[in-house]
């Protein structure tokens, strides 16, 4: 798929995410065994876990938004990754949006994050823990140059490379989305150990955070996984295509009506939203 087509799909997804959503009315996880249902951009979750807000290894940002819910696998991944980072003396992991208590569509900001298997993680690792005020109104660190062609050398740190690599090497991770310039820098820094780069995918924005996505849990029978990323490290022509100018005639698509929910998600809404 060429970059222009991908751009159109991203714009369509964004317009869907801005539609009104009833999912915010569900304020607590739906009881039951953990089940991720549907796809990452059209789904929900039963039996979500709450990420503990207090941890010595990570801090949760924007807790007032209450987007710190996810499948138990996601909670365990965050705890596992942040513990590794802490043990290596790299700093504190900053956790952004996961999902809402029952997953589902946001009213803006995300087209995915619907099945409890996605998390945004800042690409900075402070040595000093942030204050409550900093966590509520976090200042993102833009690692990408103004022209989007490369990372800012004074901001790019070996610890950030290691953070992304550790996440990509996790057994449950299927994709990590970062800005193309960040992917390019990872390709330059990786050396001969490159298998993990396959999971790191270039995507629009993502200049200050990585978006980590887990594979569908084996016992979530209604969860829809994406196809695996293409073979190889993704550092060749596909990556370079992201730096080409947009083709003439590219226009913004009309807003798209959200697709029907999976039946189990619709039934969940019908039961829990008045």
From Swiss-Prot:
**Residue span of region Disordered:** 227-274
Top EC category? hydrolase
Tell me if Disulfide bond is a UniProt keyword of this record: yes
Gene name, Swiss-Prot/TrEMBL: mepA
Tell me where in or outside the cell this protein is found.
Periplasm
| Binding, Zn(2+) 1 | 110, 113, 120, 211
Cofactor stoichiometry and binding?
A: Binds 2 Zn(2+) ions per subunit. Zn(2+) ion 1 is bound in the active site. Zn(2+) ion 2 is bound at the dimer interface by residues from both subunits.
Alphabetized, the UniProt keywords read: Disulfide bond, Hydrolase, Metal-binding, Metalloprotease, Periplasm, Protease, Signal, Zinc
Q: What is this protein called?
A: Penicillin-insensitive murein endopeptidase
Q: Quaternary state and partners of this protein?
A: Dimer.
Query: Which biological process annotations from GO are given for this protein?
Result: peptidoglycan metabolic process; proteolysis
Organism listed in the record: Shigella dysenteriae serotype 1 (strain Sd197)
Q: Does the keyword RNA-binding apply?
A: no
Cystine links in this protein are 44-265, 187-235, 216-223
Q: Which cofactor does it need?
A: Zn(2+)
């Amino acid at each position: 798929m060429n970059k222009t087509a991908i751009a159109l799909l991203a714009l369509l997804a964004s317009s869907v995410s801005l539609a009104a959503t009833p999912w915010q009315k569900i304020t607590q996880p739906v009881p039951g065994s953990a089940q991720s249902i549907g796809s990452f951009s059209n789904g929900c979750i039963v039996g979500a876990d709450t990420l503990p807000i207090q941890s010595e290894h990570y801090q949760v940002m924007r807790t007032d938004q209450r987007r710190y819910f996810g499948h138990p696998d996601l909670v365990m991944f965050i705890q596992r990754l942040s513990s590794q980072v802490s043990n290596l003396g790299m700093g504190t992991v900053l956790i952004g949006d996961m999902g809402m208590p029952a997953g589902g569509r946001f009213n803006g900001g995300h087209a995915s994050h619907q099945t409890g298997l996605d998390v945004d993680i800042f690409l900075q690792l402070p040595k000093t823990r942030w204050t409550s005020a900093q966590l509520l109104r976090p200042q993102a660190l833009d690692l990408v140059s103004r022209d989007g062609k490369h990372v800012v050398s004074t901001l790019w740190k070996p610890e950030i490379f290691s953070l992304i690599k550790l996440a990509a090497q996790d057994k449950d991770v299927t994709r990590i989305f970062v800005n193309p310039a960040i992917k390019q820098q990872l390709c330059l820094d990786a050396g001969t150990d490159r298998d993990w780069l396959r999971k790191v995918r270039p995507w629009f924005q993502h200049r200050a955070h990585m978006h980590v996505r887990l594979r569908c849990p084996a016992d979530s029978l209604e969860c829809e996984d994406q196809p695996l990323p293409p073979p190889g490290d993704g550092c060749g022509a596909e990556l370079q295509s992201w730096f080409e100018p947009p083709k003439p005639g590219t226009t913004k698509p009309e807003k798209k009506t959200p697709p029907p929910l999976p039946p189990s998600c619709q039934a969940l809404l019908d039961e829990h939203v008045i």
